[in-house]
């Protein structure tokens, strides 16, 4: 259409249309290669994340859930919850190495480098955690838990693994099952309000646990010594809070909700919201890049990048394109990389894949 317009204007000068067409095509051939690639390069250089590798996952459907990393063994683990497997990738290249079967619906993964073992949470209308050999990839043992096993968080100080379970539609309470990761034993439970919870964070001392009480639209604070809920902070005008990161040095807690997609900053001393910003839809994982003071929240189609200016001020700096339901991610600061899993639930033609992004200065 633009070429026809130019030809028409050119024709008004007295030149024949055929001559004008040759001139237009020549100009396009000369200038498009010069300007278009340089614009793309500049955009990539300015972006906070640069896609450096993609590993397609043909034959997979449904959702991925959470990652785990084995730095020494150069492995990346990914829970393929609807495929009923844990996938193993080369951490540096993204190459697929192995598929661990034997699960019903795997969710969270804890890698134990001292013993080269994994603990995998597994459940929906059932519940268990599985201990997996990191060499043979065989399931060595399981612990039965209430139905609805889902997310989990590890306390490196006590070596306890807190696993969400129980609840369900209409339930008044649910549980955090405490698994002694060193001895692989169920050693206790913490009762939480509402029918379920999502992401959690533990302070450096291993004394407090923060949890998204998604069933009641609150953030909960648990005293890990007494195993009691000691505070409940309402999430204003939003619900389905999924992601969480703790910035302990600034006394700040970051969470992200899905309805609407919003990033919140809480003051951990007061339980009050400091500020909020829009973020990626259908978010599930979020990470704090401490050296660069950046937050990465992964959701469907994009990763939101937010810059922390100081404890109270935050700036939305980018929406980095990813893929459909690309909500699952892990930050590996040792490699300056963000790994993202593109899912496919509800979309028959979805192209599931592992994406590797290099963090830019």
Regions found by a protein language model. Give the residues of each.
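Sensor of tandemly repeated, compositionally biased sequence architecture
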Residues: 4, 34-42
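Bacterial N-terminal signal peptides
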Residues: 18-37
């Amino acid at each position: 259409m633009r070429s026809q317009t130019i030809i028409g204007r050119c024709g008004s000068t007295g030149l024949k249309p055929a001559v004008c067409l040759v001139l237009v095509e020549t100009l396009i051939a000369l200038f498009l290669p010069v300007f278009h690639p340089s614009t793309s390069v500049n955009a990539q250089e300015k972006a906070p994340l640069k896609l450096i590798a993609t590993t397609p996952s043909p034959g997979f459907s449904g959702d991925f859930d959470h990652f785990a990393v084995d730095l020494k063994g150069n492995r990346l683990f990914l829970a393929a919850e609807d495929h009923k497997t844990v996938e193993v990738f080369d951490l540096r290249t993204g190459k697929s190495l192995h598929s661990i079967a034997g699960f019903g619906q795997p969710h969270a993964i804890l890698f134990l480098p001292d013993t080269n073992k994994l603990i995998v949470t597994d459940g929906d209308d059932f519940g268990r955690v599985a201990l997996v050999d990191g060499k043979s990839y065989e399931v060595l043992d399981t612990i039965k838990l209430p139905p609805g096993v889902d997310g989990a968080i590890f306390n490196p100080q006590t070596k306890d693994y807190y696993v969400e379970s129980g609840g369900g539609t209409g339930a008044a309470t649910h549980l955090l099952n405490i698994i002694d990761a060193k001895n692989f034993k169920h050693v206790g439970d913490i009762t939480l309000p509402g029918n379920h919870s999502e992401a959690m964070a533990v302070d450096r001392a291993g004394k407090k646990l923060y949890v998204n009480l998604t069933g009641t639209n609150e953030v909960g604070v648990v005293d890990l010594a007494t195993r009691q809920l000691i505070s409940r902070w309402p999430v204003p005008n939003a619900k389905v809070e999924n992601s969480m990161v703790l910035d302990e040095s600034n006394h700040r807690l970051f969470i992200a909700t899905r309805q609407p997609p919003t990033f919140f900053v809480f003051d951990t001393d007061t339980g009050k919201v400091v500020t909020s910003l829009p973020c990626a839809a259908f978010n599930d994982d979020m990470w704090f890049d401490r050296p660069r003071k950046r937050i990465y929240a992964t959701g469907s189609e994009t990763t939101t990048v937010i810059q922390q200016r100081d404890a109270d001020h935050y700036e939305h700096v980018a929406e980095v394109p990813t893929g459909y339901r690309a909500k699952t991610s892990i930050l590996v600061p040792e490699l300056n990389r963000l790994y993202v899993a593109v899912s496919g639930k509800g979309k028959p033609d979805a192209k599931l894949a592992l994406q590797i992004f290099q963090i830019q200065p």
